[in-house]
């Protein structure tokens, strides 16, 4: 009898604690509210406009360099004959080299800008687009740096052997044209990739993989030998996924706590 009384008291305590729990007494949040707060929102990459602006500036610079070099300095590179002495007291080649340095600085700033936004989108779980453009976004700056190295060698040769001045001008203009072609190809490929990504508006990679694994017939077998590069990519992908899940869980916990607090605050206090 005593044991039965204790069991009844225990059940009464549990029932009373459940009834007094405000979280259990709170109403469930509607489904659309949960989706609005917990579904990751897509943020497009805003780098396409800046990339297009830079390659347009690059194109204008090369065209002006060709016009200035051919019209002002091509007949005799040792004598600048620009109308109105626009480049005075600097020579035409000096103005072209200074413009090239400014263009390299713009490419450096672009690379930093792209890296900043790509790091942000990597933190949101889009590791595939980050890895697919990791080397592409740096290639334009590498091309500009390589061109600067070649121009420096040309200027050194011109300083030691100043006689074939017209040849040096031809080499400088040829390097500028080659840089323009290579940079435009890289930036065009990058622009196409980012535009497709922004247009598709995909969910984070881990959610996209869940959709794929929901249909086993679409999964190809990967048994057999794996190369070292493949293993490195798998390890890097797993690390990125773990980091994303940690940040996502922390964000969901904060949002859930905020929603619960706001829902409890809207309810009238129990008497």
Swiss-Prot record:
Residues bearing the modification Phosphothreonine: 15
Subcellular location: Lysosome membrane; Late endosome
Main location: membrane
InterPro entries cross-referenced by the UniProt entry: TMEM192
Chain positions found as Phosphotyrosine: 213
Modifications after synthesis and translation: Not N-glycosylated.
Pfam families xrefs: TMEM192
Membrane side Lumenal: residue ranges: 68-93, 160-171
Subunit architecture: Homodimer.
Family: Belongs to the TMEM192 family.
Protein name as catalogued: Transmembrane protein 192
């Amino acid at each position: 009898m005593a044991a039965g009384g204790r069991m009844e008291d225990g059940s009464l305590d549990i029932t009373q604690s459940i009834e007094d729990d405000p979280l259990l007494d709170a109403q469930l949040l509607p489904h659309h509210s949960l989706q609005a707060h917990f579904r990751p929102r897509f943020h497009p990459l805003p780098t396409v406009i800046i990339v297009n602006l830079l390659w347009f500036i690059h194109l204008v610079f090369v065209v002006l360099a060709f016009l200035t070099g051919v019209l002002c300095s091509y007949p005799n590179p040792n004598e600048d004959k620009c109308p109105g002495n626009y480049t005075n007291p600097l020579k035409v080649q000096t103005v072209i080299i200074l413009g090239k340095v400014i263009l390299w600085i713009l490419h450096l700033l672009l690379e930093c800008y792209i890296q900043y936004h790509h790091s942000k989108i990597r933190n949101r779980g889009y590791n595939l687009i980050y890895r697919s453009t990791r080397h592409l976004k740096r290639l334009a700056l590498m091309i500009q740096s390589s061109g600067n190295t070649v121009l420096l060698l040309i200027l050194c040769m011109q300083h030691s052997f100043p006689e074939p001045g017209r040849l040096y001008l031809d080499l400088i203009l040829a390097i500028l044209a080659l840089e323009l072609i290579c940079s435009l190809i890289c930036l065009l490929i990058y622009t196409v990739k980012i535009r497709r990504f922004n247009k598709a508006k995909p969910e984070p990679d881990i959610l996209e993989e869940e959709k794929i694994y929901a249909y086993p017939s679409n999964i190809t077998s990967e048994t057999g030998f794996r190369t070292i590069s493949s293993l490195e990519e798998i390890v890097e992908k797993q690390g990125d996924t773990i980091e994303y899940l940690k940040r996502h869980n922390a964000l969901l916990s904060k949002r859930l706590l905020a929603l619960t607090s706001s829902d409890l605050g809207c309810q009238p206090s129990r008497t």
